[in-house]
Amino acid sequence: MNLPKPLLPVLSALRAAGGRPRVVGGGVRDWLLGLEPKDFDLEVHGLDYEALGRALAPFGPTDLVGRSFGVMKLRLDGTEYDFSLPRRESKTGSGHRGFAVAPDPTLSEAEAAARRDFTINAIAYDPLEDRLLDFHGGKADLEKRVLRHTGPGFSEDPLRVLRAFQLAARFDLTLAPETAALCRAISDSYAELPVERVWGEWAKWAAKSVKPSRGLVVLKETGWLRHFPEIAALDGLPQEPEWHPEGDVFTHTSHCLDALVGLATWRDSAEPERRILSLAVLGHDFGKATTTKQAERRGKLRWVSPEHEAAGGPLVEAFLQRIGAPLELTAHVRPLVMNHLLHHHGAAEYRDTTVRRLARKLIPATIDQLIAVMLADHLGRPPLIPRETVVRIEHLRNAAQRLALEHDAPRPILLGRHLIALGLRPGPQFTPALEAAFESQLDGAFADEAGAIEWMRNYLRAHPPVLSSTSSPLP
């Protein structure tokens, strides 16, 4: 493991003081997976808190805010590192926060590792001897892509089930059967979790997954799917086999999510936009739960879900509110869900006015985001991938790019100041005039300021009640 150079003399000083520093947690896991570690958390054995502070003091001021947990923070070259003592945890109450934590320098390294949630997170690395300390088989589990709890204490913290949900998706892991059974046994503990911690795990799933469907499988295997009724309603919900050979809506949604993370739009996006896209794809068919029925189509009785896009809007909003998603994210996701089938309606080519109005309708989401949701939806029907649907989606992309509306929406060219310049006094008559101007702009009546002013001159001549409020004759 290549450690940051500023850490190396600190590690030597800790050893000289009688300590045994270990890199622990996700940094070791990521390194073993061939990923660049983002965090270097250090656990120091053999020293008490005061001795740890004395050893770190020559390298700069330490932050003792985590003293009660045996944690000391040290900033080196602009990066903050956590140095912690091994600690014991005892259950004192219900929920994620019902623990008493006590630093214990005498704790063995195996005992310290046992308090971690999963074996893949319980591997330690000795940076001075360049060796792994793997007391619970985490390396073997990582090689087999298995997510397994470290010990019986796992069940004391229900948040660990949602950690399993997002870790399985982030690292393409399957849940060990005995871990799934333990999660099922504590399913009723979900209600004890603070909503902000629930959202924290969903946010990681939505932004960091390499195979998001793994997370949904974990929720299903553990019985925790029932805590998210909008998703649970998709499990077993039938679809017309001719159009959806992959199976029910839950299966379709799983395929869509896995397709999404393969798209360039998702890969090239920052985490906030990834969350929008992932949660829009997750919820794009929530409306099918309330609209699916059998009806005759093309001379045959088929499963259909008419107007499920519109029905999905309130459902995805309720889901996001329940898991604690920010309101800003919900504002993006809802219009994407409610418009994800636009490419199935109307002509194959998109008129400019259609694209302008769509971009406006999606605010604050964008056409580029909608196209990603459409493509994921389309690719989530293996082995059925009709070429004509891809062509229609690409036509929409091309039209949006030509109008420079892929990432933006039209803004009104004509503003109140233009009406004042034309001689109108500010007042309620501005509203209908400006609304009419913007509607005509979306229809393509004008595309620049000069055209907008000329259009307004004609509008005012045709609407004498508006003219009556002018301070002078129309120029």
Q: Where in the sequence are the language-model features?
A:
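Catalytic cores of the polymerase beta-like nucleotidyltransferase superfamily
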Residues: 1-475
